[in-house]
């Protein structure tokens, strides 16, 4: 009798186990779940470093028989990967035609100091915005969104007759994509 009870208990437990197994579970056909996102093209000018020429000496060092005054600065950009871009530099706040100029002491006929900006070396390829006689710097697409920094080469031509004082200008950097 104990054996029959044991057998009945085993059969009942086995039946319950089979009924709960996936073989007997109800199911429906599987359906794909669509997951989407879009990544927009985006670029920003993320940093700049001033083009600081330092002292200009029109009497000896930078006179017409002297040397040009050269220096560098930089423009940093961050862009969506795979996005080809260009960086434009406008003519500045004090330009005369296509000539960039730094403003000096007010009220002087010699209140401007001419300068130029370049993409590759002082006196090399002029860096502009396409409207100021020079082209933007075209950049190949990046494989990541890390900041990329580009050197801005600056030159103040020798032989300018300017008054004593501080000279400055502001150039707008724009990333086009």
Predicted regions and their residues:
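Bacterial N-terminal signal peptides that target proteins for export
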Residues: 2-11
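Classic N-terminal secretory signal peptides
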Residues: 11-17
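N-terminal signal peptide c-region/cleavage motif recognized by signal peptidases
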Residues: 20-22
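N-terminal small/polar-rich segments of proteins
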Residues: 25-108, 137-177
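Predominantly extracellular/luminal cell-surface or secreted proteins
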Residues: 90-92, 116-120
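Surface-exposed, low-hydrophobicity beta-strand/loop segments enriched in small/polar/acidic residues
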Residues: 109-114
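Short linear motifs in low-complexity, proline-biased tails and propeptides
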Residues: 119, 124-127, 163-166
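Extracellular beta-sheet repeat scaffolds used for adhesion and glycan interaction
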Residues: 122-146
